[in-house]
Amino acid sequence: MRTQKVFTTIDTHTGGNPTRTLISGLPKLLGETMAEKMLHMKKEYDWIRKLLMNEPRGHDVMSGALLTDPCHPDADIGVIYIETGGYLPMCGHDTIGVCTALIESGLIPVVEPITSLKLDTPAGLVEVDIFVRDGKAKEVSFCNIPAFILKHITVDVENIGTVEADIAYGGNFYAIIDAKSVGLELVPEHASTIIDKAIHIRNIINERFEIIHPEYSFIRGLTHVEFYTDPTHESAHVKNTVVVPPGGIDRSPCGTGTSAKLAVLYANQKIEMNEEFVHESIVGSLFKGCVINTTNVANMEAVVTKITGSAWLMGMHRFFYNEKDPLKEGFLLIPPMEHETEDVK
């Protein structure tokens, strides 16, 4: 078969949300840090992200991971997180999906009952424990980068009213909002309304507030909106729905969103150190999380969290890139997000 370029992926889902892990075909990325490699990817090879994420090969909430050589001397593997909306410094459900794919495809040595990895990500070093039985990844736990509350805001939003939100970071920036306060019921049949309100709120917040990570200036702008409400699953403490860029719903409880939520709960003395917290998604899937340590980020109080979830292997793809295909980079039928990742400073 004659084709110009071939990309091989392993597809998994974590709590219903997809991860497409690219295992071959990625050019060598340059940079002394994973953030620099991510920005090199964006500048020179963004067409690969579009090919793999956008329709007709992907869909509006497709996400994935690119495996690279790590930059950190203690890391085993470098990971860059991608989605239809662009690039993420960190992604929890993708981390669970990537590690499950690595184990079950035999790409890394497997140690039972626990295989430990250190991932180098644009957000920092992430330590992972994969619980393995009979060669299968049963659960994945990762210690996330420090999570913190950046600010609490109140903003008037046209056609919605006064919105109160905690702007919290757990690997991405989240506006964490009580769903009932903005007239939302977090059920699949209300998905369109949830997305519309989230995008409207996100745009207003980005217009009126400066949101920048105090240590990594390339991480800026509100990208995710996380609504929460009472749980419906008997094992859960909170039910959430996260709207991801550019405008789709995370089917999982969202790993970095769970870290951000734990930062809010801990700061408000609503959860204790090492107390288990179970987060439910809009489709009923669950993540477990807990605060395992405290730290500081630029003189702000922060927490280190451990997030646990499971992913499922779905299959493999070989994608062919044909220069003559008029839709070689795909398309999206939703508006692009205005926020852009800036250069590393």
UniProtKB/Swiss-Prot annotation:
<comment type="similarity">
    <text>Belongs to the proline racemase family.</text>
</comment>
<dbReference type="Pfam" id="PF05544">
    <property type="entry name" value="Pro_racemase"/>
</dbReference>
<dbReference type="InterPro" id="IPR008794">
    <property type="entry name" value="Pro_racemase_fam"/>
</dbReference>
<dbReference type="GO" id="GO:0047580">
    <property type="term" value="F:4-hydroxyproline epimerase activity"/>
</dbReference>
<protein>
    <recommendedName>
        <fullName>Uncharacterized protein BA_2834/GBAA_2834/BAS2643</fullName>
    </recommendedName>
</protein>
